[in-house]
Amino acid sequence: MSKLIYEDLSYKIIGIIFKVYNKLGYGYHEKYYQRAIVIELNKENLNFTREKEIRLSYQNENIGKYFLDFIIENKIVLELKVANSFYPQDMKQILSYLKASGLKLGILAIITKGGIEYKRIVN
C-alpha cells in the first residue's frame, strides 16, 4: 500500500475545515468560511498564504494568472467552495492550480447542506 502525500498535514487541514463547519454550520458565503479557516490555521501555527497570485507564462510572456484560496506550508493548495456537489470545472481548476504552482497536492473541499466533502488531488 502506498503512503499518502503529506498525510499528516492534509488530515490537519481537513480537520480544520470540519471544525469551522461544525462551529458555523451551513449557509454563509465562501469568504466567511475562509476567514474562519485563517483563524484556525494561525492557531495551529501553520504557514500559509491566502489568495496567492500565480502567473502563467508562455515564452517569457505573461498570459494570465490564477488566485489560489490557500497555499499551506508551501506544499498543499486548498480550494474551498460552497456548493451542492463537486463539479468537473472545480476539478479542472485545482489541477490547473497545481500545474501552475508546481505543487504536488491539492485539497478541494466543498461546504454543503449535509456537511463537508473533500477530495485530495495529486499533480
Give residue ranges: language-model regions.
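Well-ordered beta-strand positions
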Residues: 49, 69-71, 110
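A short acidic/basic microdomain associated with nuclease active sites
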Residues: 44-60
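Structural motif
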Residues: 58, 63, 72-73
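Conserved catalytic cores of phosphodiester-cleaving nucleases, focusing on short active-site segments
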Residues: 25, 70-84, 97
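Structural motif corresponding to alpha-helix initiation and N-cap regions
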Residues: 64-65, 91
